[in-house]
């Protein structure tokens, strides 16, 4: 399944993996998964975290290594994001609920994820998604960005 991913997708997933793998040991534990989920405004129980890991933990060691992570991401991409998942993701970024993601909101979420971005990088991310050029990302633009991957 992971063999259907492009080089670029694999590189992006490698970056995402290292955001989860806080101690850099090459595996994601339930604790690390929980930290990331909570920084995204989710509140999974210990059992839910364990279930998420067990779903893809091919070698049964209780953690997710990079090949297992790739399998999980490939699977997730196959059941392409439902409208509801995309709306939920938009709400995570749209902190003030005004229907737009501003540069400040994007920076806030990325910083919570442990991703330190320069102002230029944040502005570039906004520009890439900002179709109407108003300097922020509305829901339609967000959907286009999420589904054009």
From Swiss-Prot:
Q: Which positions does UniProt annotate for Ca(2+) 3 binding?
A: 94, 96, 98, 105
**GO CC field:** myosin II complex
Which UniProt keywords are listed?
A: Acetylation, Calcium, Metal-binding, Methylation, Repeat
List all membrane-crossing ranges: none
Q: Which domain of life is it from?
A: Eukaryota
Q: Which residues bind Ca(2+) 4?
A: 130, 132, 134, 136, 141
EF-hand domain span: 8-43, 44-79, 81-116, 117-149
The record's annotation in PROSITE patterns points to: EF_HAND_1, EF_HAND_2
Additional comments on file?
This protein has four functional calcium-binding sites.
According to UniProt, the name of this protein is Calmodulin
Organism from which the protein derives: Renilla reniformis
């Amino acid at each position: 399944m992971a063999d259907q991913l492009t080089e670029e997708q694999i590189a992006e997933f490698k970056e995402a993996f290292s955001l989860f793998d806080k101690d850099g040991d090459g595996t994601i534990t339930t604790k690390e998964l929980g930290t990331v989920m909570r920084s995204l405004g989710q509140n999974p129980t210990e059992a839910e975290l364990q279930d998420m890991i067990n779903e893809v933990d091919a070698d049964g060691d209780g953690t997710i290594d990079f090949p297992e992570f790739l399998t999980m991401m490939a699977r997730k991409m196959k059941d392409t994001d439902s409208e509801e998942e995309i709306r939920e993701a938009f709400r995570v970024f749209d902190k003030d609920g005004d229907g737009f993601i501003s540069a400040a909101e994007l920076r806030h979420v990325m910083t919570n994820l442990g991703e330190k971005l320069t102002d230029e990088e944040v502005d570039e991310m906004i520009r890439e998604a900002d179709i109407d050029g108003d300097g922020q990302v509305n829901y339609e633009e967000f959907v286009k960005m999420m589904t054009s991957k």
